[in-house]
Amino acid sequence: MMVCLDRNTCLKMYELITEKWQLAIELQEKELVEEEIIHCHDPDILDEKRKHLAWMKETKFAVVVSSEQSEIEEVAKFNDHSGKPLDILKHRKLMQERKLDEEFKDSNNPLGFVIVCAMWLTGFDVKSLSTLYIDKPMQNHTLMQAIARANRVAPGKKQGTIIDYN
């Protein structure tokens, strides 16, 4: 989970993260093919790499933010890192059509990373959440609630990690 300063930052981070994620998948695919053909590594290591690559391909991302009147027009005034206008429609549609909160709580669901600005920071318990990225100034109760997200106990979870960019 990543906590961003505002809705537009969430949308920009989504674009950046998913773009980099896809590049990482392509790089791992290339490396795996090279190792299978050229280097003929240990089959167990190759199997682990195949599993990791499959997990990367299955992992889904979502932006979860509160809706506002005239948000489509407001968001479109800003550009992403490549210069294209930001678009909240695909994210809003996803939030309306699916129960993203339930999906994210299910550790077997491919929804593995959400980007939020205020939603889900208080009163939202995801025991399996292991890493929280904070890119937003927070204090008092909101900060404690956010930190608590990564500190829940869950089967197979050894620790929680908090990365604060502020």
Residue positions per predicted region:
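A short beta-strand element within the Helicase C-terminal
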Residues: V114-V116, W120-P137, T142-Q145, G160-D164
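Catalytic micro-motifs at enzyme active sites that drive phosphoryl/nucleotidyl and oxygen chemistry
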Residues: R50, M119, A150-N151
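Conserved segment of the helicase C-terminal RecA-like domain
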Residues: D106-P110, L143-N166
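Short, well-ordered loop/turn and helix-capping segments at boundaries between secondary-structure elements
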Residues: E19, L23, D135, R149-G156
